Amino acid sequence: MSPLQWLTISFALIIFHSLTVSSSVLSHSDRVTRLPGQPRVGFQQYSGYVTVDDKKQRALFYYFAEAETNPSSKPLVLWLNGGPGCSSLGVGAFSENGPFRPKGPILVKNQHSWNQEANMLYLETPVGVGFSYSTQSSHYEGVNDKITARDNLVFLQRWFLKFPHYLNRSLFITGESYAGHYVPQLAELMIQYNKKHHLFNLRGIAIGNPVLEFATDFNSRAEYFWSHGLISDSTYKMFTSYCNYSRYVSEYYRGSMSSMCSKVMSQVSTETSRFVDKYDVTLDVCIPSVLSQSKVVSPNQVGESVDVCVEDETVNYLNRRDVQEALHARLIGVREWTVCSNVLDYQLLDVEIPTINIVGSLVKAGVPVLVYSGDQDSVIPLTGSRTLVSRLAKQLGLRTSVPYRVWFAGQQVGGWTQVYGNVLSFATVRGASHEVPFSQPERSLVLFKAFLDGHPLPEEF
């Protein structure tokens, strides 16, 4: 019997079984009794491994925080960070929208955690990221988007075996940065799988500052730098005429850097200054920097951070033995947990493969899509994302259902938004960085709630 057939039979049995089993049964081995230094909370947490390839012993690590209140009536949301190769546990759960943030030896409550509105599932993917591992190091080589999407699909299938009462729950997939590749490709596989075995109740995807189309996303950086006064007129001309950013990245990863691109990027780097955080151009920087979020989107600036003015509390916390024991986590083949993988050899040229066309197919299939942008991010600027969404709406023949306007959060302008055909949405988040939930937690929560509810963003206080 093939693994797929076995899974299908297992799901049928579980659906029947889950009708008679209460949620109390979920006090299984993955339950987190209490994280070290954690404040008292009323929701359940789980973490552990799901094997995605029994033969090769490849396992993905997850952290699951149920909703603070009424988890049985709230949707399931999968969160994926990008990189490729950066941790959804360290960046997403413990620095952005999860229930806690490390502060010295303790955890403090995130007052704008997304598990106020949903059951949040964070996945360290692909294998080789964070606590996710393979027993054979050769499996870290040549990893690409297709392998990652396939493993993520198998993860979800098998995760439902652990949590059967979430099988029919509304499911949303969210993420940021290179998750602009991860999220649409996973959603596409889910829709294909559902044609034969209806398993996933996919209700929408939301991606923040996403890599969707190589040239448009990357080349919008020049205009962003120039419009924010970070480069001169002459450098802007060089950056748009002689060597744009997509050409630079392409040459960089092919190991064939031209003298022209080297000269242009040297001038751009000199003018923008290494003391300006490209992920949040308004943020004052400190040394040392904190959390590396991206290798692909900024190859000459590996090591930039979520917040460069804060000590790396997350790395210290997740490398504590007592924390790893509480999370049921293991270090396999590595000496320490890192925010972004040092062992993963990802096929970085996959960044050149557009995923905006997959987003279009999802929209045509009736899956609501939200693309949102922190407006202080110069790495994947809002201008590129806005252009791509507008262009896609035109290609699909979608008319504007919510004209471009401001939206509000906490009696302040939260950003701007436009909706096409009540299924494709674009929104900016005012004052937000590449990592929107980190830099603007309240506004990101308002955005998240509206997305889950299927409502337009608030147009008044």
Swiss-Prot record:
InterPro entries: AB_hydrolase_fold, Peptidase_S10, Ser_caboxypep_his_AS, Ser_caboxypep_ser_AS. Its main location: secreted. One of its GO terms (molecular function) is serine-type carboxypeptidase activity. Disulfide bonds join 86-340, 243-261, 286-309. It comes from the Eukaryota. Ubiquitous. Keywords: Carboxypeptidase, Disulfide bond, Glycoprotein, Hydrolase, Protease, Secreted, Signal. The active site is at residues 177, 377, 434. Belongs to the peptidase S10 family. PANTHER family: SERINE CARBOXYPEPTIDASE-LIKE 45 (PTHR11802:SF500), SERINE PROTEASE FAMILY S10 SERINE CARBOXYPEPTIDASE (PTHR11802). This is Serine carboxypeptidase-like 45. It comes from Arabidopsis thaliana.
